[in-house]
Amino acid sequence: MIKYDKLWITLKKKNISQYKLIKYYGVDKAQLQRLRNNEIVKTLIINRLCNILDCNVEDIMEYVPDEKISKS
């Protein structure tokens, strides 16, 4: 699973609010909602956030392995 928990930490460190992302950088509210819910997001959005925040992809997202499903 891809998780975007690091995005919110990076936003805080860079002193950029969600309001600012929407108002000044044109990030769609629906995209932010998808990120909040760890849902599918286009790589274009990830690239854009990295440019806005001047950061690397690992600063806004991480891979967390899904729990293995045991076959019984």
Task: Say what each PLM segment does.
Residues 15-33:
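Short alpha-helical DNA-recognition segment
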Residues 9, 61-72:
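Short, charged recognition helix plus adjacent turn
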Residues 12, 23, 51:
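Alpha-helical residues within the helix-turn-helix
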Residues 12, 26, 37, 65:
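Residue-level detection of the helix-turn-helix DNA-binding "recognition helix"
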Residues 38-51:
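Short, basic-rich loop-to-helix N-cap that marks the start of a DNA-contacting helix
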Residues 1-20:
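A short, Lys/Arg-rich alpha-helix, primarily the initiator
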